[in-house]
Curated annotation (Swiss-Prot):
The keyword Signal does not apply. This is Small ribosomal subunit protein bS6. HAMAP family: Ribosomal_bS6 (MF_00360). Binds together with bS18 to 16S ribosomal RNA. Belongs to the bacterial ribosomal protein bS6 family. InterPro entries: Ribosomal_bS6, Ribosomal_bS6_CS, Ribosomal_bS6_sf, Ribosomal_S6_plastid/chlpt, Transl_elong_EF1B/ribsomal_bS6. The gene is rpsF.
Length: 116
């Protein structure tokens, strides 16, 4: 069964444009090899970090939205953890609500006043 996921990761700011593109392609191919589909990549650009991470004040933010089996996440995150180009990552399982018809309220029986 496949699930929708969103992964946001931050690359080191000292990577050049070509190196950043190679890293993005590397992780995209890794996901595809693990069975991911519908991979959407958004390069959010270089931004200031809220606090220093591994002696870096800036980072290149990349967002991935994809559909993958649950077994694809562990190898993907392991590759990021071992990589020196990624300084932080987070994967979130997205709950996409299916449209359900509204529940019909049961009609309450009306009480009829008895006249005596």
């Amino acid at each position: 069964m496949t699930t929708n996921y969103e992964t946001m990761y931050i690359l080191r700011p000292d990577l050049g444009d070509e190196q950043a593109e190679q890293a993005i392609t590397k992780y995209q191919n890794l996901l595809r090899d693990q069975g991911a589909e519908d991979i959407q990549i958004q390069n959010r650009g270089k931004r200031r970090l809220a606090y220093e991470i591994k002696k870096h004040r800036d980072g290149i933010y990349i967002q991935l939205n994809y559909t993958a089996p649950a077994t694809a996440i562990a190898p993907f995150e392991r590759a990021m953890r071992l990589s020196e180009e990624v300084i932080r990552y987070l994967t979130i399982k997205q709950d996409i609500a299916e449209e359900k018809p509204p529940k019909e309220e049961k009609e309450k029986p009306t009480k009829v006043a008895a006249t005596v």
